[in-house]
Amino acid sequence: MSVAAARSSAVKVDWGKIVSSLGLTGATVSSLQAFRKRHEEAKKNAYELQNQPTTVDFAHYRKVLKNQKVVDEIEQHFKSFKPVTYDVSKQLKTIDAFEAKAIEDAKATEGKVNQEIGDLQKTLENIESARPFDQLSVDDVFKARPDLEKKIEEMVKKGRWSVPGYNEKFGSVVLM
């Protein structure tokens, strides 16, 4: 991203809209406000530094200092100084690759979440459309769980009238 593009995007940030559109609350809002404050301070400092003079008055230092040789040497180094340029294309490519992977992962997660939401909607509709428990008949239960019918028939044939584990789980209701 170029410096001009970064500046224009920084100017266009609507902080209030970010908070309201994302529905942020509590600690997130306070963190965002702290970030905004640091951003404003950094912008102010950068502006102040840009407006400071960048020239060195070597004539003044020649008058003030006795050692003219040092001033000449520093002036020569100052004039011959060229800032080192760094090739950041590798880092930018790495960042772009990371960003692409993050977007891909986010889309995959979005798909999973949407599928889960759909499943939950179906479950909710099923729950809302189900008949109340007190209106169910034994035939309805057997239709939903055919294995229970066979299990109950087997228990009746063997003369077992209690469900194994019921008393341990729900307690005994015998009064005597």
UniProtKB/Swiss-Prot annotation:
Classification via InterPro entries: ATP_synth_F0_dsu_mt (IPR008689), ATP_synth_F0_dsu_sf_mt (IPR036228)
Disulfide cross-links: none
Domain of life: Eukaryota
One Pfam family named in its UniProt record: Mt_ATP-synt_D
Cellular component, GO annotation: mitochondrial inner membrane; proton-transporting ATP synthase complex
Keyword DNA damage recorded: no
Keyword Iron: no
Location(s), subcellular: Mitochondrion inner membrane
Biological processes per GO annotation: proton motive force-driven ATP synthesis
Annotated GO MF terms: proton-transporting ATP synthase activity, rotational mechanism
Bilayer disposition of the protein: Peripheral membrane protein
Key words, A-Z: ATP synthesis, CF(0), Hydrogen ion transport, Ion transport, Membrane, Mitochondrion, Mitochondrion inner membrane, Transport
Protein family (similarity comment): Belongs to the ATPase d subunit family.
PANTHER family, per the entry: ATP SYNTHASE SUBUNIT D, MITOCHONDRIAL
Subunit-level organization: F-type ATP synthases have 2 components, the catalytic core F(1) and the membrane-embedded component F(0), linked together by a central stalk and a peripheral stalk. The central stalk, also called rotor shaft, is often seen as part of F(1). The peripheral stalk is seen as part of F(0). F(0) contains the membrane channel next to the rotor. F-type ATP synthases form dimers but each monomer functions independently in ATP generation.
Function: Mitochondrial membrane ATP synthase (F(1)F(0) ATP synthase or Complex V) produces ATP from ADP in the presence of a proton gradient across the membrane which is generated by electron transport complexes of the respiratory chain. F-type ATP synthases consist of two structural domains, F(1) - containing the extramembraneous catalytic core, and F(0) - containing the membrane proton channel, linked together by a central stalk and a peripheral stalk.
Name the record gives this protein: ATP synthase subunit d, mitochondrial
Annotated organism of origin: Yarrowia lipolytica (strain CLIB 122 / E 150) (Yeast)
